């Protein structure tokens, strides 16, 4: 068996980096394994920016990760590797001279690790609605509004029109003329639609809510917002969404093609897609999920349904913000450290 470490952190985003830092501050041995796959990494967008993080507002998320890893390098008991973890299991060992529960993880390169505590910071993946063109517009002409979503959106200077969170992004588009809200999937709920529309109105003169043929939802939303002069509701089906070819004389927009053949131009669209776990490691450990699909944890220390295993960040919370992810990592580090120091 390989040398036993105090804690293994799987995932190198804000949550995993925060957990590693907290454990380092208590002088524990920590290995962080990073698959280098992040929810806010979009290859087609050269100038991705993050927001809602004090001291790092409107800066690149990849630079944030580099800076955090650089800070961790001064801790002599910390190690970082860019490798995906393919399997993890719980076992026992007497290697330290006493019987203790361990977690064994195997990386894609065959390297194995044994740790007393395990922290999962493995993130989530977005599940897009079945609307033609949506994935091509995602994070290019579409914001997602939710106080429960991590930064993924792109600012105006990226010249794209599809975004993810109007707290994290949207300010750069505050002078828009018309914005569309896609009330489909998890967003097809009256109070959610109303909240999205009101927030989008902070950045646009007018809002169109697209229900994609759900006239019942449209009627419910109308009762809430129908008297607002800035809001209109479209109950036609959506055939596709797309971004027209940009020319020097044209603004960057998103086109919504409807079932009757008409097309509506929007400065950007707003939608919150569903998410699923980005890693299957939780299944190998038999961890419980919430009804929303997040790993079930006990706050404030973010321990899962299995003792000694913690889950932090997007994979374990509806609040998918960078700042809340980093904070959850710190709480899990405290919980793991207390258990290690108490000998359990």
From Swiss-Prot:
SUPFAM superfamilies reported for this sequence: FAD/NAD(P)-binding domain
UniProt similarity note: Belongs to the class-II pyridine nucleotide-disulfide oxidoreductase family.
Pathway note: Mycotoxin biosynthesis
Disulfide bonds: 165-168
EC number: 1.8.1.-
Residues that bind FAD: 12-15, 34-39, 51, 121, 314, 321-322
A GO BP entry: cellular response to toxic substance
Keywords, comma-separated and alphabetical: Disulfide bond, FAD, Flavoprotein, NADP, Oxidoreductase, Redox-active center, Virulence
Source organism per UniProt: Gibberella zeae (strain ATCC MYA-4620 / CBS 123657 / FGSC 9075 / NRRL 31084 / PH-1)
Database matches in InterPro entries: FAD/NAD-bd_sf, FAD/NAD-binding_dom, Ferredoxin-NADP_redctase_2
Cofactor binding remark: Binds 1 FAD per subunit.
Chain segments annotated as transmembrane: none
Any one Pfam family match given in the protein's UniProt record, by short name: Pyr_redox_2
A molecular-function term among this protein's GO annotations: oxidoreductase activity
Cofactors: FAD
Record function comment: Thioredoxin reductase; part of the gene cluster that mediates the biosynthesis of gramillins A and B, bicyclic lipopeptides that induce cell death in maize leaves but not in wheat leaves. The nonribosomal peptide synthetase GRA1 incorporates respectively a glutamic adic (Glu), a leucine (Leu), a serine (Ser), a hydroxyglutamine (HOGln), a 2-amino decanoic acid, and 2 cysteins (CysB and CysA). The biosynthesis of 2-amino decanoic acid incorporated in gramillins could be initiated by a fatty acid synthase composed of the alpha and beta subunits FGSG_00036 and FGSG_11656.
Description of how the protein assembles with itself and partners: Homodimer.
Protein name: Thioredoxin reductase FGSG_00043
